Amino acid sequence: MRNVFRTARLTRSARAIVKTLLIAIATVTFYFTSDLALPQSAAAYPFWAQQTYPETPREPTGRIVCANCHLAAKVTEVEVPQSVLPDTVFKAIVKIPYDLSAQQVGADGSKVGLNVGAVLMLPEGFKIAPEDRISEELKEEIGDTAFQPYSEDKENVVIVGPLPGEQYQEIIFPVLSPNPATDKNIHFGKYSVHVGGNRGRGQVYPTGEKSNNSVYNASATGTITKIAKEEDADGNVKYLVNIQPESGDVVVDTVPLGPDLIVSEGQAVKTGDALTNNPNVGGFGQIDAEIVLQDSSRVKWMIAFVALVMLAQVMLVLKKKQVEKVQAAEMNF
């Protein structure tokens, strides 16, 4: 019997290892094929956060991890109801505004449009509404947007993207609220909602390498002796900037196609000086909101209380007028 349990445990461990390896291979393959072999438009890929931070996209400090790759800060907005009833579908609208005329560099260095992506962190128990609970009107508003849970056990954390920014500056999430009557882990009260939205490509890959959508800096102090343009076997163009220090060998900084060089041969530079402009026009923003899971019975009692107060006020007014009439009659008598 013990051997059977041991075998089952080993089988589960083996499956977990295989799954992890497959995810890693898929991630690495996608990275190289999408950005090198098949350059795409400037995109925002929220699933990088899934692969790099599988537990949660929010750090203990409150920062959403997308900011680790998208270094520029931009505005993100969210609209959620102030309160919702249990087991109801409502809209959470994430707005990712940017200048639609803006273009940035793609992986091949060409100017392309921006894509957008978003992560919506709902309270425990909240999740994307199943299709049979979404009204036809809401389906039209959502369009072809595909919603993906951050992980199998976190249906309340949802990611979307990449989507074409020209069409999706507003992303509508159809959210189903939980019902405390059927789930004892859920309680009525006020909850926090965390939202992150990014437009365009990041400046740093999850591996720590810079993308070509970033500023490149001098790695040594000295004089630029040569700037050469080179193309590798895969057709990727890059610039080689030779820096001659006062002593020692020449230092060669590689700049990919995309950012524009702002230095020239014969120019003196210091370590950290910018060799290129900043081509990035996108960025990431996050915002928090609050939502109340309202008890319908409390709402009914509140309505009854307000009605009672209003009735009492009406009765007082009528009584006051009655007293005034009696007083007037006594004075006339």
From Swiss-Prot:
Q: Membrane-crossing residues?
A: 17-36, 299-319
Required co-factor?
Answer: heme
Per the entry, the cofactor note is: Binds 1 heme group covalently.
**SUPFAM superfamilies per the UniProt record, alphabetical:** Cytochrome f subunit of the cytochrome b6f complex, transmembrane anchor, Cytochrome f, large domain, Rudiment single hybrid motif
**Location of the protein in the cell:** Cellular thylakoid membrane
Residues that bind heme: Y45, C66, C69, H70
MF terms per GO, please? Answer: electron transfer activity; heme binding; iron ion binding
Q: Which GO terms describe its cellular component?
A: plasma membrane-derived thylakoid membrane
Where does the secretion signal sit in this chain? 1-16
> What keywords would UniProt list here?
Electron transport, Heme, Iron, Membrane, Metal-binding, Photosynthesis, Signal, Thylakoid, Transmembrane, Transmembrane helix, Transport
Q: How does it sit in the membrane?
A: Multi-pass membrane protein
Q: Which PROSITE patterns match?
A: CYTF
- Recorded family membership: Belongs to the cytochrome f family.
Question: Subunit structure of this entry?
Answer: The 4 large subunits of the cytochrome b6-f complex are cytochrome b6, subunit IV (17 kDa polypeptide, PetD), cytochrome f and the Rieske protein, while the 4 small subunits are PetG, PetL, PetM and PetN. The complex functions as a dimer.
Role noted for this protein: Component of the cytochrome b6-f complex, which mediates electron transfer between photosystem II (PSII) and photosystem I (PSI), cyclic electron flow around PSI, and state transitions.
Name this polypeptide is given:
Cytochrome f
